């Protein structure tokens, strides 16, 4: 069964958005999509009163779990991914749209997987499980999308990853020194 994509947004997304969504979902095993009914593209997400969220934040995506007889579905806000103000903000958002959409969609799909299909994940472990799932499948999606730039930088990836880990470690140590 294929996941349906509905566009309820007044914001015009890039023309191949549906193909992008299908390519992102193709990077995830088909069993992990079991039960996911649809993906809805909207302008902004208006959470209902059951969801506690700080004011002033704009959700890029929201997962709606199974409720009664309705199957689970995902909602993605194009207003958060494609801002309407400022030429350079709009340009940067259009250039990064594919990657941002992949991150949001894989995060929502990870929530679906961890809440409905995966067993043994406790509430306290949910955020870490979703993050690791998203990173794993984002990496595989990015590798499948790789053009000439990806092929050129592939030999340098291990070195760049080690450098990023050392910078992250140094950042965490500095953060501990400042708070401690």
What are the residue ranges of the model-derived segments?
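A metal-dependent hydrolase signature that marks the N-terminal structural subdomain at the beginning
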Residues: 1-75, 88, 171, 175-179
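Long, well-structured alpha-helical subdomains associated
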Residues: 6, 14-15, 140-180
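Hydrophobic (often cysteine-bearing) scaffold residues that line and stabilize catalytic clefts
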Residues: 17, 98, 102, 126
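Mid-chain, well-packed structural core segment of small domains
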Residues: 80-95
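Active-site recognition of the HExxH zinc-binding catalytic motif
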Residues: 99-116
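Soluble, non-transmembrane catalytic domains of enzymes that act on hydrophobic metabolites at membranes
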Residues: 116-118, 122, 127, 147
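An active-site-proximal "capping" alpha-helix that borders the catalytic cofactor pocket
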Residues: 124-140
